[in-house]
Amino acid sequence: MKPITPLAAYIKQPLLALPISLLLVACGNGSNVAGSDNSGQNPTPTIAPSQPDPAPTSAPVLSYGRLAVAEADQTNVRLLDLDSGNIAADISLQNPASALYRSPQSGYVVAIQRNQDKVEFIDSGLLASQPEAPSLHSFSIEQAKPTHFDLSSTAASLFFDGDQGAGINAGFQVLTDSSIKQAKALASHDFTQAMHGTAQLRGEFALTTFRSDVATTSLPDQVVVMHQHNDHYHEEKTITESCPGLHGSMQGIHWTVFGCEDGVLAIKQVGEEFSAIKIPNIATMVDTRIGTLKGSHKHDKFLGLTRTQQAFLVDPENNLMTEILWRDQPETTFLAYGVDHHQAHFLMLDSKGYLGVYEIEEDFKRVAYIKVLDSVPNLNSGQKFNITSSGSQAHVYISDPVNNNLLTVDLTSEAVIKQLALAFSPAHIAWVGIEKEPAAHQH
């Protein structure tokens, strides 16, 4: 095993006044999604096996996990060990990552390289009986335009948009930590067309997308229900209700929702039966549409976001859409957002330097508003703040690409508890490790 590199090799000199042991210790979320969600200012579109794949339980050593930090415009991904405060590994990908996600059971970093048609996987090193150094898995996937990575409770769908100009069709693959370890997908499906689509996995079913003959862009306009048969899928039915310009999706207990140009398509599952309704856009939604949907697998109300920085509560059970007035001043914008690891909170970093914490089960009520940035830097072209959170503690991580900082926010104390100055510009971030169910929280 390679020796662990001291964190000082990757941080600016001089260091902050605090010693390294205090700069980065216990760790503490968007996917999509559960897990990390590295979204920027503009919301853009990001199955489960028949037998659930259990979370890893082989590691008896308690660990706060590791934080994967991609260097902007470089192939490097550093894994920060959150127990020792050191760099556990500096992994070199084939190409710069366009996104980082945690795997379904949080044992691997999923490194998307969309423009190069490639996905690589980093083993966290925490799944063995004793912690090991992280390593780049020999398993990789090469398929055109990997884009959306959507987590269900036990698996993840990785959607490939394909390339219409090159005659390459779209498809999706179903992954679990077990299948990644075995260097294969659990199941897959190939379409007969290219499209910027998505797939939501519900047990042995997949709700995925299709472009009809009347679709005029790369965005789909229909939802198809598919049924898993071992390592592949068969089409069960096409949902009659259309969804022009479909973009963004999320699932709850019974409902799965998709953003459309004219509203939100909501599909309810009862046993093996699926029925749909369309919730139309409301009058306060001016010259825009919902393009991103967030929520929890344990709740059937969802948050819809638009490019014009509006937010809406989507309630399919009551066929309602209601605007959430999340900002006190019209000029306030969101810089980054995501859902925490256990899907209890929606997190939003705004342009005033505050982290808003919204309770999902209380219809996205704001329950905390934490000052995390004394001043908000101007972002250069291509730069974004990114948010992820821990699966073992109530900690949120925010990367600042301008000041090359990594902030740790404790949701219990509602304060920034660590600030790490890096020697590189951080881009995407993701937490990996052994998950721990959170204690009951109060606000």
Annotate each predicted stretch with a short phrase.
Residues 53-59, 95-108, 140-154, 188-204, ...:
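Repeated scaffold domains used in trafficking and secretory/extracellular systems
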Residues 86-92, 128-141, 145, 180-191, ...:
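A short beta-strand motif characteristic of beta-propeller blades
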Residues 28-31:
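Bacterial signal peptide processing site
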Residues 23-26:
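C-terminal motif of bacterial Sec signal peptides marking the signal peptidase cleavage site
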Residues 207-341:
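Acidic, serine/threonine- and glycine-rich low-complexity intrinsically disordered segments
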Residues 129-259:
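Long, acidic/polar, low-complexity amphipathic helices and coiled-coil-like
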Residues 72-170:
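Post-signal peptide N-terminal segment of secreted/secretory-pathway proteins
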Residues 401-407, 411-443:
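Blade-level signature of beta-propeller repeat domains, shared across WD40, Kelch, NHL, RCC1
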